[in-house]
Amino acid sequence: MKTYDLIIIGGGPAGLAAAVAAKDNGIDNILILERDKSLGGILQQCIHNGFGLHTFKEELTGPEYAARFIEQVEERGIEYKLNTMVMDISLEKVVTATNREDGILLLQAKAIILAMGCRERSRGALNIPGYRPAGIYSAGTAQHLVNMEGLMPGKEVVILGSGDIGLIMARRMTLEGAKVKVVAELMPYSGGLKRNIVQCLDDFDIPLKLSHTVIDIEGKHRVEAVTIAEVGPDRKPIPGTEERYTCDSLLLSCGLLPENELSKSAGVELSQVTSGPVVNDSFETSVAGIFACGNVLHVHDLVDFVSQEATAAGKNAAAYIKAGEKDAQAVMLPISPEGGVRYTVPSFVRPSEMEENLTVRFRVGDVYKNKVIAVYFDDQLISKKKRQVMAPGEMEQVILKKNKLEEYPETKKITIRIEEA
Protein backbone atom coordinates (compact mmCIF):
# COMPACT_ATOMS: atom_id res chain seq x y z
CA MET A 1 0.00 0.00 0.00
CA LYS A 2 1.45 3.33 -1.07
CA THR A 3 1.53 6.12 1.52
CA TYR A 4 1.10 9.83 0.86
CA ASP A 5 1.30 12.76 3.24
CA LEU A 6 -1.78 14.34 1.65
CA ILE A 7 -4.45 12.96 -0.68
CA ILE A 8 -6.86 15.43 -2.26
CA ILE A 9 -10.09 13.99 -3.62
CA GLY A 10 -11.24 16.13 -6.53
CA GLY A 11 -9.19 18.10 -9.06
CA GLY A 12 -11.54 21.03 -9.50
CA PRO A 13 -10.85 24.61 -8.37
CA ALA A 14 -10.93 23.63 -4.66
CA GLY A 15 -8.63 20.62 -5.01
CA LEU A 16 -6.12 22.52 -7.15
CA ALA A 17 -5.91 25.53 -4.81
CA ALA A 18 -5.59 23.25 -1.76
CA ALA A 19 -2.78 21.26 -3.41
CA VAL A 20 -0.83 24.40 -4.32
CA ALA A 21 -1.20 25.80 -0.79
CA ALA A 22 -0.11 22.53 0.85
CA LYS A 23 2.95 22.32 -1.42
CA ASP A 24 3.86 25.94 -0.69
CA ASN A 25 3.64 25.14 3.03
CA GLY A 26 6.23 22.39 2.91
CA ILE A 27 4.33 19.20 2.00
CA ASP A 28 5.90 17.39 -0.96
CA ASN A 29 4.20 13.99 -1.04
CA ILE A 30 0.78 15.01 -2.42
CA LEU A 31 -1.66 13.15 -4.70
CA ILE A 32 -4.75 14.59 -6.41
CA LEU A 33 -7.40 12.05 -7.49
CA GLU A 34 -9.79 13.25 -10.24
CA ARG A 35 -12.55 11.15 -11.83
CA ASP A 36 -12.78 13.24 -15.03
CA LYS A 37 -10.39 13.15 -17.98
CA SER A 38 -8.85 16.53 -17.11
CA LEU A 39 -8.21 18.75 -14.11
CA GLY A 40 -10.33 21.86 -13.61
CA GLY A 41 -13.65 20.35 -12.59
CA ILE A 42 -16.86 22.16 -13.53
CA LEU A 43 -14.89 25.23 -14.68
CA GLN A 44 -14.02 23.48 -17.96
CA GLN A 45 -17.64 23.77 -19.13
CA CYS A 46 -18.20 27.30 -17.75
CA ILE A 47 -16.95 29.17 -20.81
CA HIS A 48 -18.63 32.46 -19.81
CA ASN A 49 -16.64 35.22 -18.13
CA GLY A 50 -16.91 36.64 -14.62
CA PHE A 51 -14.30 34.46 -12.88
CA GLY A 52 -11.15 35.67 -11.13
CA LEU A 53 -12.12 39.23 -10.22
CA HIS A 54 -11.09 38.69 -6.57
CA THR A 55 -8.23 36.21 -7.06
CA PHE A 56 -6.47 37.62 -10.13
CA LYS A 57 -8.05 41.11 -10.29
CA GLU A 58 -9.12 40.45 -13.88
CA GLU A 59 -12.11 38.88 -15.61
CA LEU A 60 -11.50 35.34 -16.90
CA THR A 61 -13.57 32.51 -18.35
CA GLY A 62 -13.89 29.27 -16.37
CA PRO A 63 -11.28 27.34 -18.41
CA GLU A 64 -8.84 30.29 -18.16
CA TYR A 65 -9.25 30.41 -14.37
CA ALA A 66 -8.72 26.63 -14.12
CA ALA A 67 -5.68 26.81 -16.42
CA ARG A 68 -3.92 29.23 -14.06
CA PHE A 69 -4.21 26.78 -11.16
CA ILE A 70 -3.39 23.74 -13.33
CA GLU A 71 -0.22 25.59 -14.38
CA GLN A 72 0.70 26.13 -10.71
CA VAL A 73 0.14 22.43 -9.98
CA GLU A 74 2.34 21.42 -12.95
CA GLU A 75 5.08 23.92 -12.00
CA ARG A 76 5.25 22.45 -8.49
CA GLY A 77 5.38 18.87 -9.78
CA ILE A 78 2.32 17.79 -7.79
CA GLU A 79 1.26 14.23 -8.69
CA TYR A 80 -2.29 13.64 -9.94
CA LYS A 81 -4.28 10.75 -11.38
CA LEU A 82 -7.09 11.38 -13.89
CA ASN A 83 -10.02 9.07 -14.76
CA THR A 84 -9.70 7.78 -11.21
CA MET A 85 -12.81 7.07 -9.18
CA VAL A 86 -12.55 7.10 -5.38
CA MET A 87 -14.88 4.47 -3.97
CA ASP A 88 -14.23 4.60 -0.24
CA ILE A 89 -12.40 6.40 2.55
CA SER A 90 -11.92 4.30 5.67
CA LEU A 91 -11.80 5.54 9.25
CA GLU A 92 -8.01 4.91 9.14
CA LYS A 93 -7.65 7.30 6.15
CA VAL A 94 -7.16 4.51 3.61
CA VAL A 95 -8.47 5.66 0.24
CA THR A 96 -9.80 3.00 -2.15
CA ALA A 97 -9.79 4.14 -5.78
CA THR A 98 -9.87 2.58 -9.23
CA ASN A 99 -8.75 3.39 -12.76
CA ARG A 100 -7.88 1.49 -15.93
CA GLU A 101 -4.10 1.71 -15.58
CA ASP A 102 -3.72 0.70 -11.93
CA GLY A 103 -6.88 -1.32 -11.30
CA ILE A 104 -7.83 -1.11 -7.62
CA LEU A 105 -5.65 1.30 -5.63
CA LEU A 106 -5.27 1.26 -1.84
CA LEU A 107 -3.63 4.48 -0.65
CA GLN A 108 -2.76 5.43 2.93
CA ALA A 109 -2.87 9.15 3.77
CA LYS A 110 -1.70 11.14 6.78
CA ALA A 111 -4.30 13.79 5.89
CA ILE A 112 -7.12 14.00 3.35
CA ILE A 113 -8.78 17.04 1.77
CA LEU A 114 -12.33 16.50 0.49
CA ALA A 115 -12.93 18.61 -2.64
CA MET A 116 -15.57 16.59 -4.53
CA GLY A 117 -17.77 19.54 -5.45
CA CYS A 118 -21.54 19.31 -5.78
CA ARG A 119 -24.23 17.90 -8.05
CA GLU A 120 -27.58 19.13 -9.30
CA ARG A 121 -30.96 18.10 -7.94
CA SER A 122 -32.49 15.63 -10.38
CA ARG A 123 -36.02 15.58 -11.74
CA GLY A 124 -36.77 12.64 -9.44
CA ALA A 125 -35.90 14.73 -6.39
CA LEU A 126 -38.28 17.48 -7.53
CA ASN A 127 -41.42 15.33 -7.93
CA ILE A 128 -42.64 17.16 -11.05
CA PRO A 129 -45.90 15.64 -12.36
CA GLY A 130 -46.39 14.76 -16.03
CA TYR A 131 -44.91 12.44 -18.65
CA ARG A 132 -41.24 11.55 -18.93
CA PRO A 133 -40.37 12.33 -22.55
CA ALA A 134 -36.96 13.23 -24.01
CA GLY A 135 -35.96 16.87 -23.66
CA ILE A 136 -35.77 17.24 -19.87
CA TYR A 137 -32.24 18.16 -18.75
CA SER A 138 -30.55 19.58 -15.72
CA ALA A 139 -29.07 22.98 -16.56
CA GLY A 140 -25.54 21.62 -16.01
CA THR A 141 -26.13 18.77 -18.49
CA ALA A 142 -27.42 21.27 -21.05
CA GLN A 143 -24.35 23.42 -20.40
CA HIS A 144 -22.08 20.42 -21.03
CA LEU A 145 -23.91 19.54 -24.26
CA VAL A 146 -23.72 23.08 -25.64
CA ASN A 147 -20.25 24.14 -24.46
CA MET A 148 -18.32 20.85 -24.57
CA GLU A 149 -20.09 18.69 -27.16
CA GLY A 150 -21.42 21.37 -29.51
CA LEU A 151 -24.95 19.94 -29.32
CA MET A 152 -28.20 21.90 -28.90
CA PRO A 153 -30.63 20.40 -26.34
CA GLY A 154 -33.57 22.17 -27.98
CA LYS A 155 -34.89 25.21 -29.83
CA GLU A 156 -37.79 26.31 -27.61
CA VAL A 157 -36.91 26.22 -23.94
CA VAL A 158 -38.60 26.61 -20.55
CA ILE A 159 -36.36 26.79 -17.47
CA LEU A 160 -37.50 25.78 -13.97
CA GLY A 161 -35.44 27.34 -11.20
CA SER A 162 -33.37 30.51 -11.17
CA GLY A 163 -30.07 29.22 -9.82
CA ASP A 164 -26.96 30.71 -11.40
CA ILE A 165 -26.51 27.83 -13.87
CA GLY A 166 -30.12 28.19 -15.04
CA LEU A 167 -29.72 31.94 -15.53
CA ILE A 168 -26.44 31.51 -17.42
CA MET A 169 -28.00 28.79 -19.62
CA ALA A 170 -30.94 31.08 -20.43
CA ARG A 171 -28.42 33.49 -21.94
CA ARG A 172 -26.33 30.74 -23.55
CA MET A 173 -29.31 29.09 -25.25
CA THR A 174 -30.48 32.50 -26.51
CA LEU A 175 -27.03 33.27 -27.94
CA GLU A 176 -27.04 29.90 -29.71
CA GLY A 177 -30.36 30.70 -31.40
CA ALA A 178 -32.91 29.07 -29.10
CA LYS A 179 -35.99 30.86 -27.78
CA VAL A 180 -36.16 30.84 -23.98
CA LYS A 181 -39.83 31.41 -23.26
CA VAL A 182 -39.82 31.77 -19.48
CA VAL A 183 -37.81 31.12 -16.32
CA ALA A 184 -40.09 29.93 -13.49
CA GLU A 185 -38.94 30.04 -9.85
CA LEU A 186 -40.81 28.34 -7.00
CA MET A 187 -39.58 30.79 -4.35
CA PRO A 188 -40.61 34.46 -4.12
CA TYR A 189 -36.96 35.41 -4.79
CA SER A 190 -34.30 34.28 -7.27
CA GLY A 191 -31.70 31.73 -6.24
CA GLY A 192 -28.99 33.39 -8.35
CA LEU A 193 -26.75 36.44 -8.18
CA LYS A 194 -28.33 39.81 -8.98
CA ARG A 195 -25.75 40.46 -11.70
CA ASN A 196 -26.73 37.21 -13.44
CA ILE A 197 -30.42 38.17 -13.41
CA VAL A 198 -29.54 41.49 -15.07
CA GLN A 199 -26.95 40.17 -17.57
CA CYS A 200 -28.69 36.89 -18.47
CA LEU A 201 -32.43 37.64 -18.28
CA ASP A 202 -33.09 41.40 -18.32
CA ASP A 203 -30.60 42.12 -21.13
CA PHE A 204 -32.27 39.46 -23.31
CA ASP A 205 -35.89 40.24 -22.35
CA ILE A 206 -36.41 36.78 -20.86
CA PRO A 207 -39.31 36.82 -18.35
CA LEU A 208 -38.69 35.62 -14.78
CA LYS A 209 -41.82 34.45 -12.97
CA LEU A 210 -41.28 34.21 -9.22
CA SER A 211 -43.56 32.01 -7.06
CA HIS A 212 -44.28 29.77 -10.08
CA THR A 213 -43.60 26.09 -10.71
CA VAL A 214 -44.13 23.43 -13.39
CA ILE A 215 -47.32 21.44 -12.77
CA ASP A 216 -47.48 19.40 -15.99
CA ILE A 217 -45.20 18.15 -18.77
CA GLU A 218 -46.80 17.10 -22.07
CA GLY A 219 -45.33 14.90 -24.78
CA LYS A 220 -45.00 11.19 -25.43
CA HIS A 221 -41.60 10.91 -27.14
CA ARG A 222 -40.36 14.50 -26.86
CA VAL A 223 -41.42 17.42 -24.65
CA GLU A 224 -44.22 19.27 -26.45
CA ALA A 225 -45.42 21.71 -23.78
CA VAL A 226 -45.18 22.50 -20.09
CA THR A 227 -47.76 24.13 -17.84
CA ILE A 228 -46.66 26.43 -15.04
CA ALA A 229 -48.81 27.87 -12.26
CA GLU A 230 -48.43 30.40 -9.49
CA VAL A 231 -47.91 29.01 -5.99
CA GLY A 232 -49.15 30.38 -2.68
CA PRO A 233 -47.18 30.85 0.55
CA ASP A 234 -47.53 27.08 1.14
CA ARG A 235 -45.79 26.54 -2.26
CA LYS A 236 -48.82 24.69 -3.63
CA PRO A 237 -50.22 25.65 -7.08
CA ILE A 238 -53.11 28.13 -7.09
CA PRO A 239 -56.00 26.86 -9.30
CA GLY A 240 -56.79 29.21 -12.18
CA THR A 241 -53.23 30.59 -12.56
CA GLU A 242 -52.07 27.96 -15.06
CA GLU A 243 -50.11 29.05 -18.16
CA ARG A 244 -49.19 26.64 -20.96
CA TYR A 245 -45.98 27.08 -22.97
CA THR A 246 -45.21 25.04 -26.08
CA CYS A 247 -41.55 23.98 -26.01
CA ASP A 248 -39.24 21.08 -26.86
CA SER A 249 -36.95 21.30 -23.82
CA LEU A 250 -37.25 21.82 -20.09
CA LEU A 251 -34.09 22.74 -18.17
CA LEU A 252 -34.00 22.21 -14.40
CA SER A 253 -31.93 24.55 -12.22
CA CYS A 254 -33.34 23.72 -8.81
CA GLY A 255 -30.37 23.81 -6.52
CA LEU A 256 -27.07 22.05 -5.91
CA LEU A 257 -26.19 19.43 -3.31
CA PRO A 258 -22.67 18.84 -1.94
CA GLU A 259 -21.38 15.43 -3.08
CA ASN A 260 -20.77 13.81 0.31
CA GLU A 261 -21.17 10.04 -0.05
CA LEU A 262 -17.42 9.61 0.55
CA SER A 263 -17.54 11.91 3.58
CA LYS A 264 -20.16 9.63 5.15
CA SER A 265 -18.00 6.54 4.65
CA ALA A 266 -15.12 8.36 6.39
CA GLY A 267 -17.36 9.02 9.41
CA VAL A 268 -17.49 12.79 8.86
CA GLU A 269 -20.37 14.66 10.56
CA LEU A 270 -22.59 16.49 8.03
CA SER A 271 -24.63 19.67 8.48
CA GLN A 272 -28.39 19.23 8.16
CA VAL A 273 -28.65 22.65 6.50
CA THR A 274 -25.84 22.57 3.91
CA SER A 275 -25.51 18.76 3.53
CA GLY A 276 -21.76 19.42 3.71
CA PRO A 277 -19.27 18.58 6.48
CA VAL A 278 -19.27 20.48 9.77
CA VAL A 279 -15.84 22.16 10.01
CA ASN A 280 -13.83 24.27 12.45
CA ASP A 281 -11.77 27.39 11.67
CA SER A 282 -9.04 25.33 9.94
CA PHE A 283 -11.63 23.61 7.67
CA GLU A 284 -11.01 20.36 9.57
CA THR A 285 -14.04 18.07 9.81
CA SER A 286 -15.19 16.08 12.84
CA VAL A 287 -12.56 13.46 11.88
CA ALA A 288 -9.03 14.59 12.76
CA GLY A 289 -6.87 14.99 9.66
CA ILE A 290 -9.75 15.14 7.17
CA PHE A 291 -10.39 18.62 5.78
CA ALA A 292 -13.07 19.93 3.40
CA CYS A 293 -13.30 22.91 1.05
CA GLY A 294 -15.19 24.20 -1.97
CA ASN A 295 -18.69 23.16 -3.01
CA VAL A 296 -18.48 19.86 -1.12
CA LEU A 297 -18.51 22.00 2.04
CA HIS A 298 -21.23 24.49 1.02
CA VAL A 299 -22.37 25.74 -2.37
CA HIS A 300 -20.57 28.93 -3.44
CA ASP A 301 -21.55 31.77 -5.78
CA LEU A 302 -17.99 32.71 -6.75
CA VAL A 303 -15.06 30.43 -7.53
CA ASP A 304 -12.75 33.05 -6.00
CA PHE A 305 -14.21 32.26 -2.57
CA VAL A 306 -13.73 28.54 -3.25
CA SER A 307 -10.04 29.20 -3.93
CA GLN A 308 -9.69 31.28 -0.74
CA GLU A 309 -11.22 28.55 1.44
CA ALA A 310 -9.23 25.81 -0.31
CA THR A 311 -5.98 27.72 0.16
CA ALA A 312 -6.71 27.92 3.90
CA ALA A 313 -7.61 24.20 3.99
CA GLY A 314 -4.36 23.29 2.20
CA LYS A 315 -2.29 25.41 4.56
CA ASN A 316 -3.99 23.95 7.63
CA ALA A 317 -3.66 20.38 6.34
CA ALA A 318 0.08 21.01 5.91
CA ALA A 319 0.30 22.25 9.51
CA TYR A 320 -1.58 19.15 10.71
CA ILE A 321 0.77 16.79 8.83
CA LYS A 322 3.84 18.51 10.31
CA ALA A 323 2.49 18.61 13.87
CA GLY A 324 0.83 15.20 13.88
CA GLU A 325 -2.42 14.49 15.68
CA LYS A 326 -2.68 16.49 18.88
CA ASP A 327 -4.07 14.71 21.93
CA ALA A 328 -5.10 17.88 23.75
CA GLN A 329 -8.10 19.34 22.01
CA ALA A 330 -8.22 23.13 21.89
CA VAL A 331 -11.32 24.85 23.29
CA MET A 332 -14.00 24.95 20.57
CA LEU A 333 -16.59 27.73 20.52
CA PRO A 334 -19.74 27.05 18.48
CA ILE A 335 -20.90 29.72 16.02
CA SER A 336 -24.67 29.85 16.31
CA PRO A 337 -26.69 31.06 13.29
CA GLU A 338 -29.87 32.80 14.46
CA GLY A 339 -32.52 35.29 13.35
CA GLY A 340 -32.46 34.74 9.59
CA VAL A 341 -28.94 33.27 9.25
CA ARG A 342 -29.29 29.70 7.92
CA TYR A 343 -25.79 28.36 8.64
CA THR A 344 -22.18 29.46 9.03
CA VAL A 345 -18.88 28.08 7.72
CA PRO A 346 -16.99 27.36 9.88
CA SER A 347 -19.36 26.03 12.57
CA PHE A 348 -16.73 26.11 15.33
CA VAL A 349 -13.81 28.37 16.24
CA ARG A 350 -10.74 27.57 18.35
CA PRO A 351 -9.62 30.93 19.79
CA SER A 352 -6.12 29.63 20.56
CA GLU A 353 -5.54 28.23 17.05
CA MET A 354 -7.42 30.60 14.73
CA GLU A 355 -5.90 33.14 12.31
CA GLU A 356 -5.75 36.82 13.32
CA ASN A 357 -8.70 37.52 11.00
CA LEU A 358 -11.14 34.68 10.31
CA THR A 359 -13.72 35.02 7.53
CA VAL A 360 -17.06 33.44 8.46
CA ARG A 361 -19.34 32.92 5.44
CA PHE A 362 -23.08 32.33 5.62
CA ARG A 363 -26.39 32.62 3.78
CA VAL A 364 -29.64 34.20 4.90
CA GLY A 365 -32.99 32.42 4.71
CA ASP A 366 -35.02 35.21 3.09
CA VAL A 367 -34.71 38.58 1.35
CA TYR A 368 -33.87 41.33 3.86
CA LYS A 369 -33.70 45.08 3.20
CA ASN A 370 -31.97 47.70 5.36
CA LYS A 371 -30.96 45.28 8.12
CA VAL A 372 -27.75 44.71 10.06
CA ILE A 373 -25.60 41.64 10.57
CA ALA A 374 -24.93 41.49 14.32
CA VAL A 375 -22.17 39.45 15.99
CA TYR A 376 -22.43 38.54 19.69
CA PHE A 377 -19.99 36.89 22.10
CA ASP A 378 -22.54 35.29 24.44
CA ASP A 379 -24.88 38.27 25.10
CA GLN A 380 -22.29 40.96 24.37
CA LEU A 381 -22.77 42.78 21.04
CA ILE A 382 -19.37 42.92 19.31
CA SER A 383 -20.05 44.30 15.83
CA LYS A 384 -22.78 45.44 13.47
CA LYS A 385 -22.63 45.67 9.69
CA LYS A 386 -25.41 47.40 7.79
CA ARG A 387 -26.60 45.84 4.51
CA GLN A 388 -29.10 47.42 2.13
CA VAL A 389 -30.15 44.10 0.59
CA MET A 390 -29.44 40.49 1.55
CA ALA A 391 -30.81 37.52 -0.38
CA PRO A 392 -30.41 33.72 -0.13
CA GLY A 393 -28.72 33.67 -3.56
CA GLU A 394 -25.79 35.80 -2.40
CA MET A 395 -23.29 34.68 0.22
CA GLU A 396 -22.55 37.05 3.11
CA GLN A 397 -19.51 37.21 5.36
CA VAL A 398 -18.21 38.70 8.60
CA ILE A 399 -14.66 38.87 9.96
CA LEU A 400 -13.92 37.50 13.45
CA LYS A 401 -10.81 38.99 15.03
CA LYS A 402 -8.63 36.85 17.28
CA ASN A 403 -7.61 39.79 19.50
CA LYS A 404 -11.30 40.60 20.08
CA LEU A 405 -11.99 37.03 21.22
CA GLU A 406 -8.99 37.24 23.58
CA GLU A 407 -10.65 40.25 25.24
CA TYR A 408 -13.58 37.97 26.18
CA PRO A 409 -11.89 34.77 27.43
CA GLU A 410 -15.05 33.51 29.14
CA THR A 411 -17.06 33.41 25.89
CA LYS A 412 -19.01 30.16 25.46
CA LYS A 413 -20.79 30.90 22.17
CA ILE A 414 -20.57 33.22 19.15
CA THR A 415 -23.90 34.25 17.62
CA ILE A 416 -24.50 35.77 14.18
CA ARG A 417 -27.99 37.10 13.46
CA ILE A 418 -29.93 39.55 11.30
CA GLU A 419 -31.44 42.48 13.19
CA GLU A 420 -33.30 45.73 12.53
CA ALA A 421 -31.04 48.61 11.53
Would you name each region that the model predicts?
Residues M1-I9, A67-E156, G232-G240, L251, ...:
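FAD-binding core/adjacent interface of flavoenzyme oxidoreductases
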Residues Y4-R68, Q72, H144-N147, P153-Q199, ...:
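Beta1-alpha1 glycine-rich phosphate/pyrophosphate-binding loop at the start
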Residues I70-A97, T174-E261, E356-Q388:
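A Rossmann-like FAD-binding core segment of flavoenzymes
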Residues I104-L105, A111-L208, T213-R222, G289-A292, ...:
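Predominantly flavin-linked oxidoreductase catalytic cores and closely associated redox partners
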Residues L114, I136-V146, S249-H300:
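FAD-site-proximal beta/loop scaffold in flavoenzymes
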Residues D304, A312, N316-K385:
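Mid-to-C-terminal Rossmann-like scaffold of FAD/NAD(P)H-dependent oxidoreductases
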Residues V360, I373, N403-A421:
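Short, aromatic- and glycine-rich surface loops/edge beta-strands on solvent-exposed regions
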Residues P392-K401:
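Aromatic sugar-binding surface patches on proteins
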